[in-house]
UniProtKB/Swiss-Prot annotation:
Annotated compartments: Cytoplasm
Source organism of the structure: Methylobacillus flagellatus (strain ATCC 51484 / DSM 6875 / VKM B-1610 / KT)
Top-rank EC class of the record's enzyme: transferase
Sequence positions that bind S-adenosyl-L-methionine: 44-46, 64, 88, 109, 116
Major location category of this protein: cytoplasm
A Pfam family that the UniProt record links to this protein: Methyltransf_5
Reaction equation(s) it catalyzes: cytidine(1402) in 16S rRNA + S-adenosyl-L-methionine = N(4)-methylcytidine(1402) in 16S rRNA + S-adenosyl-L-homocysteine + H(+)
Stated name of the protein: Ribosomal RNA small subunit methyltransferase H
Gene field: rsmH
Matching NCBIfam families: 16S rRNA (cytosine(1402)-N(4))-methyltransferase RsmH (TIGR00006)
Length: 321
């Protein structure tokens, strides 16, 4: 096990603080009788706030692929609320099964929750030694340990570089393969963190050398960017006119996808200025960005340091088909 790996009981550290709570829910411009989707229930901070603003005829459907989140949702006894064990890329299918064709707002909080980070047995963090799992949904799919055990050096390099934006990806991949060749079964977060620390020649101030590698593996194992890319067009199709899409991202890879999607739907008439066509014949925007990207206040970052990289983008559905 690497130095610095903590064995603090999860119960002592896993309190989740919802990021941009007021800002995200306000951005949805809740209608009392509206239908809303919380695509990432987590520990329910956003869902509870939405329910506070809904009237008796309102409705909220929440999704999460983490079984611990589904269990946490059982504490909400409200006829207006429905929790579904599902990844948000299946949103359209889930809503269809509930006979919901249109919604007035969708919220996606793409961040990993504090309990997921702080519970060592989940395998998300280099701070707490535990099985190298990293699956959001522990009932299915390949674990990080299984991927590391079989991936080639080239595959490891690609994943760590592409999803972690790690400049030392090649050195880290080489070190993993070398340890594997030497007979090591890399099955814990502590083992991996130690290998990465030994492979990285230069560490950014204030950042653990394993940060980017753990991010990369988590994103890859859970197909987070692919899920997001599949989900955004569904949100567009599901939103009623004047419906709102609010997305909180936590790193540039996610934010880039969200930003490009909104911009692509807003700037559909991106033809050359003197192109011979009437303005009325140009494709009209189906989404319009609402305000600028919102970031946590200094006070929120002080209270919850994990919020510091959060970015909230909001867009509104137009009446254009």
């Amino acid at each position: 096990m690497s130095a610095g790996i903590s064995h603090v009981p999860a119960a002592q550290v896993s309190q989740h603080v919802t990021v941009l709570l007021e800002e995200a829910v306000e951005a949805l411009s809740i209608k009392p009788d509206g239908v809303y989707v919380d695509g990432t229930f987590g520990r329910g901070g956003h869902s509870r706030k939405i329910l506070e603003k809904l009237g008796a005829q309102g409705r909220l459907v929440a999704l999460d692929r983490d079984l611990a989140a589904i269990q946490a949702a059982q504490g909400i006894q409200d006829a207006r609320f429905k929790i579904v064990h599902s990844h948000f890329a299946a949103m359209a299918q889930v809503l269809a099964s509930l006979n919901i064709q249109q919604v007035d707002g969708v919220l996606l909080d793409l961040g990993i929750s504090s309990p997921q980070i702080d519970e060592g047995e989940r395998g998300f963090s280099f701070r707490f030694d535990g099985p190298l799992d990293m699956r959001m949904d522990q009932s299915r799919g390949q674990t990080a340990a299984e991927f590391i055990a079989t991936a080639t050096e080239q595959e490891l390099t690609r994943v760590i570089k592409e999803y972690g934006e790690e400049r030392f990806a090649k050195q880290i991949a080489r070190a993993i393969v070398a340890q594997r060749a030497g007979g090591m079964d890399i099955s814990t977060t502590g083992q991996l963190a130690k290998i990465v620390a030994g492979a990285v020649p230069k560490v950014e101030p204030g950042q653990d050398p394993a940060t980017r590698t753990f991010q990369a593996l988590r994103i890859f194992i859970n197909q987070e960017l692919e899920e997001l890319s599949l989900t955004l067009p569904q949100c567009l199709s599901l939103l009623a006119p004047q419906g709102r899409l609010a997305v909180i991202s936590f790193h540039s890879l996610e934010d880039r996808i969200v930003k490009r999607f909104i911009r692509g739907e807003q700037d559909r008439d991106n033809l050359p200025a003197h192109f011979p066509v009437r303005a009325s014949d140009l494709p009209q925007p189906r989404l319009v960005a609402i305000g600028r990207a919102v970031r946590p206040s200094e006070d929120e970052v002080r209270r919850n340091p994990r919020s510091r990289s959060a970015v909230l983008r909001v867009a509104e559905r137009t009446a254009v088909l």
